[in-house]
Amino acid sequence: MGEAVYPVPAEWAQNALVDEARYQDMYRQSVDDPEGFWAEHGKRIDWIRPFTKVKNTSFHEADFGIRWFEDGTLNLAANCLDRHLAERGDEIAILWEPDSPDEAHREITYRQLHADVCRFANLLKAKGVQKGERVTIYLPMVPEAAVAMLACARIGAIHSIVFAGFSPDALAGRITDCDSRIVLTSDEGLRGGRKVPLKANVDEALKQCPGVDTVIMLRRTGADVDFVEGRDIDWATAVAEQSADCQPEEMNAEDPLFILYTSGSTGKPKGVLHTTGGYSVWASMTHQYVFDYRPGQIYWCAADIGWVTGHSYVVYGPLMNGATTVMFEGVPNFPDASRFWQVVDKFKVEIFYGAPTALRALMREGDEWVKKTSRASLRLLGSVGEPINPEAWEWYHKVVGDSRCPIVDTWWQTETGGAMITPLPGATALKPGSASRPFFGVKPALVDNDGTFLEGATDGCLVVTDSWPGQMRTVWGDHERFFQTYFTTFKGLYFTGDGCRRDEDGYYWITGRIDDVINVSGHRMGTAEIESALVAHPKVAEAAVVGMPHDIKGQGIYAFVTCNAEIEPDDLLRKELIQWVRHEIGPIATPDVIQFAPGLPKTRSGKIMRRILRKIGENDVSNLGDTSTLADPSVVDNLLANRPQLAGA
C-alpha cells in the first residue's frame, strides 16, 4: 500500500519563500559549495566584526574540530533586540499566556524587552557575573525566563537552563557539573493548576552545591518560601535599582552561548555546548525558512524553555527574525482539552509548532474540543520532539488544520541546534509520518552496522557526513566524551543515534533510537540514568530499563528490577520505586511498568542482553533471536511467564 502524499497547495508554491525549484538550487549550492553558501547566508545576522573565515571543520580524529565564522564577532542579544528597535520597537516581541485563562496575559514590546534585558544584565554584572561564567536558570515558562537568557547572552555569560520539572538531585548534578555559582528561580511554578515548589527544590539542591553564593528569586505566586539572608535576592526589587542601558559584549563566533544537559546512553547527562555565531545563523535561518516566517505573523512554539526547542524556537530564532512569539505557561488539557486552540483564537496564531505526545493526548479526548474553536487564523502547523505517527498526523491536518494547513514535521536534536530534516511548506509534498528532506547544508546518509553507506530505498543508521553551523561544539568539561559519543561509532561521520528509513523518493522516515535512549513524550531519557536511580535504592540489587510502545507518550519506560536477596517484592515496593525515581530524576522519568524478576538475562561474560529485554518490553516475544549465549535460559522463561498484562500490549 502506497503512503498518502499531500502535494504543495498552489498558493503556497506561488507565495512561499522557497518553492521546489529554489529548494533544489539552494540545497545543491549548500552541499556543493558550503563555503560560498554560508558566506552569503551567514550575513543574515548582524556582525560587529564581519567574518572572513567560513567553515573550518573535520569529523576525523587526526584533525577533529568544528569552527564556523571563527574570526567574526557579534552579540546574540543585540541580534534579538537592538537591531529591531528602530523599525519595530513598539511591536510585540512576546505574547505571554498564563497557566490559568482567568489570569491576564502579558504583551511585551521589543523596546520593553530590551529595557528588561539590560536591567537584568546589569544586575548579573552587579553580582560579579563575568563573561564565560555559567548561570543556572530553573524557571517556569514566564517572560522573565527569556529575559534571563538574553541577559546572559548580552554580557557573555553562559546559561544552563534546567527544566523546571527536574528534581532537586537532578538540578544539583547540573549545577555542580558546570560549576555555577548563581541560580535564577521562582518561588513556585504553575502548571495545569498545580503549584511546583521551585524555590524549595533549589534550597534542597543547594545542600549539595556549596559553591552557589547567589539565588535570584522571581515571585510568581507570592508563596511564603524560605529566604536565605545574604544569598537570596528578590528579583523585582533588585532589577528596579538597575539602569536600562547595558552595552552588549562583543563575542567571538566560537565563544560559548549555552549549555543544555541531555540524556545519553551512559549514566550522567551530558552538557551539550552551543557557541554564538553558528548557532545564531542556524536558529534564525531554520526558523524563517521552515515556518515560512514573515514579520508581523503571530508564531507559537508550544515547547518549554527547559528543552532545546524552547531555546531555538520560542526565544532565539523568532526574536532574531523580529517575530511575535507566544510563550505559554500551561498545559494542553487544563482547564480542558480545548486550551491550545482557545489560545490560537485569542492571539490569532498563524503558525503553531507542537509535540506529537500532546497531539495524541488531545486526539484521544475527541474532535469536539477542537471544533468548538475557530482556528481560522492558522496557516501552518509543525511537529517536533519525536516521529509523529501517520494517524496523529492525519488528525492534526484534518481536524486541527481543517485540511488546509501544511505540516512541517521536523527532525533534529539538542546536539544539532535546530531543524535538520524537514519539509519546507512551499516546496515539499508531504507524507504523513516522514520528516521528508534535509535542510540546506545538511548531508544525511544511511549506513549499516559496519559503517558501509547504503544507497537508494533502505533502512539503516542515520548519520550526517559533514558539519553545519548549528552543530554543538563539545560536551561541557569532557571533549573526549563528545568525540567518543558522536564520531567513533562510524569513523568520520556524526552518528545521530537514530534509525531511519529512506524511501524511493529520497524522503527520510525516523524509526527511533538505536542506542540506549528512550524518547518519552519527545524528551530523551537515558536508560542508564534511570537504572542508576533504581539501583541507588537500598532494596534493589540490579535494574535494566528499556522502552515500550505507549499510545500517548510514544515510548514508555519499562523497568526490570532484581531485589536484594532478603526482599520480597510487592506492589508497595513497586509504588515506592516509582516515587523514588521521580524524586531522583523528576516526573518525566516515571517508570510505566516495573517487572520484578529473580534475575536478568546475561551472557556468560556477565553482560545484560538488552535486546531480549527490549523484545519483552515491546511484547514482541515470538522471536527472541539467538539466545545461545545466555548463561541461564530459565531467567528469560521467568520474565516471559511473569510479564504484566498491559492494556493494548
Curated annotation (Swiss-Prot):
One function term, GO molecular function aspect: AMP binding
Q: Which UniProt keywords apply?
A: Acetylation, ATP-binding, Ligase, Magnesium, Metal-binding, Nucleotide-binding
Q: Where does ATP bind?
A: 385-387, 409-414, 498, 513, 524
Identify the Pfam families for this entry.
ACAS_N, AMP-binding, AMP-binding_C
Keyword presence, Magnesium: yes
| Record-listed Mg(2+) binding positions | 535, 537, 540
Q: Which residues carry this modification: N6-acetyllysine?
A: 607
Q: What is its EC number?
A: 6.2.1.1
**Which principal EC class is assigned to this enzyme?**
ligase
The processes (GO biological process) annotated in the record are:
acetyl-CoA biosynthetic process from acetate
UniProt catalytic activity: acetate + ATP + CoA = acetyl-CoA + AMP + diphosphate
Give the cofactors, semicolon-separated. Mg(2+)
- Any one GO cellular component localisation term in the record: cytosol
Q: Which InterPro entries match?
A: Ac_CoA_lig (IPR011904), ACAS_N (IPR032387), AMP-bd_C (IPR025110), AMP-bd_C_sf (IPR045851), AMP-binding_CS (IPR020845), AMP-dep_synth/lig_dom (IPR000873), ANL_N_sf (IPR042099)
Q: How is it modified after translation?
A: Acetylated. Deacetylation by the SIR2-homolog deacetylase activates the enzyme.
Task: Provide the residue positions that the database annotates as binding CoA.
Answer: 191-194, 309, 333, 521, 582
Q: Which HAMAP family match?
A: Ac_CoA_synth (MF_01123)
Function of the molecule: Catalyzes the conversion of acetate into acetyl-CoA (AcCoA), an essential intermediate at the junction of anabolic and catabolic pathways. AcsA undergoes a two-step reaction. In the first half reaction, AcsA combines acetate with ATP to form acetyl-adenylate (AcAMP) intermediate. In the second half reaction, it can then transfer the acetyl group from AcAMP to the sulfhydryl group of CoA, forming the product AcCoA.
| Similarity field | Belongs to the ATP-dependent AMP-binding enzyme family.
Q: Which NCBIfam families match?
A: Ac_CoA_lig_AcsA, PRK00174.1
Protein name per UniProt: Acetyl-coenzyme A synthetase
Organism, by scientific name, is: Novosphingobium aromaticivorans (strain ATCC 700278 / DSM 12444 / CCUG 56034 / CIP 105152 / NBRC 16084 / F199)
Question: Upper lineage ranks?
Answer: Bacteria, Pseudomonadati, Pseudomonadota, Alphaproteobacteria, Sphingomonadales
